[in-house]
Amino acid sequence: GKITKTADLFFLGGGQNVNQSRNKYGAFFEGEQELFDSLGLRLAARYEKVDNFSSLDPKISLSYNPMDQITLRISRGTSFTMPSMAQMYSSDINLGSVRDLEGSIFVRQARIGNPDLKPATSTNSNFGLIYNSDINRFSIDYWKIDYRDRIEAESSQAILDLDPQGPSITRNENGELIAVTTTYFNEESTLISGIDLSYEHIFDLSDNGILEFALKGTSFFKFLTPDQTSDDTETVLTNRIGKFNFDTHTHALPRNRINSFLTWKYKEYETGFNARYISSYENNRTIPESAASLGYSSKVDSFLVFDLSFELPIGVLFNNVSLDGKFALINLFDQNPPLLYDAPDFSFDTRVHDPRGRMLNIQFELGLMD
C-alpha cells in the first residue's frame, strides 16, 4: 500500500498508534401513552452532538390489539451514526489475495483511515404481527432501512477491477502488482429490506418435564448498493442478495438464515438439539476447468449443521456452592463447509461458513444454592 508512516515498515501485518480524541454529548427522551383500550403510542427522540456534527432523530411506534392474542405494530424513525475513530484515523497492513489481470496472487493490502468521513444517516421502518397464547408465540416483521452515506470499507478487489492502474494500485517496474491501498468511504445510498420470523411452542409432558421448540429466521429481500461499473450519471443500485459479491465493497449475502432449537427440560436436567441453516448463493467468478474438475461450481451450496448439548447438576462442593456441567457437540455430524472458488484464497467462505468441523465444548459452572 501507500502508507508512508511507521506502519510502512511492516509487510505481513502492522499498524500505527493513534492519538486522537473527540467530544460527544447525547440526550434521550421516550414517552408512552395508551390512546384507546387497544391502541398504544410510543414517542422517542435522541439528540447527539459529536464535534461539529449534530442530529435529532425521532421515532414513532404504534401498537394495536384487535384481540387479546394478536398485536399489530408499526414504527418509523431515523438514526445517526458517526464514523469510529479507527475508521477515521487508524492504518494497518495485512497480506491478502486479489485477482489481477494475469492471475491470482497474495499482495500487501494497506487500509488507512479517512478523516473526511461524514456521519451515516438512515430511515428505519417496521411493520409486524404478533400472536401470543399460553403455549404458542408467533411473530413476523417486515423491515426496511434506507441509508444515506453508510460507512463502508473499500474492497481491494473492487478497487483493482475498477482501475487496474489507478492511484491506489502499486506495481513494480515490470508491471507486477505488489500492493493495494484502501480506505473507508461514504456509500451514497443503500437500501436494505427483509423479514424476521419467530415461532415458539411449549409441549407439556406432565411428569416427563417440558419440551420447548423455537424457530427463528431472517430472509433478505433487498440489499441495494451503487453499481461502481455503471456509466450513468445517476446512481444505479444493484441487489447484492444471493451473491458472493467478490468484486464489490461488501461480502457474501445469503438470502435466508434459519435456526431451530429443541429443548427438553426435566427436573434439573436439560438437553438441547439445534439446527442452523444458511441458504445457497451464487459465485460470479469464472471457474477454470481445473477447479471444476475438483467439484467447484458457480453455486455455493447451502449449509446445514446440528448441535447437541446437555446440562446437568454434578453435586454440592461445600456449604451452599453447587457445581453444574455443560457439554455440547457443535456441528454434530462433522459437516464440511460448502466449496467456494476464490483462488488464491481458501476454498470456503471465511465470512459465512465455519470450517472447524465437529467440536466438543465442556463447561463447569459454580453457583450459590438458595
Range-by-range predicted roles:
Residues W143-R148, E154-R285:
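Gram-negative outer-membrane beta-barrel transporters
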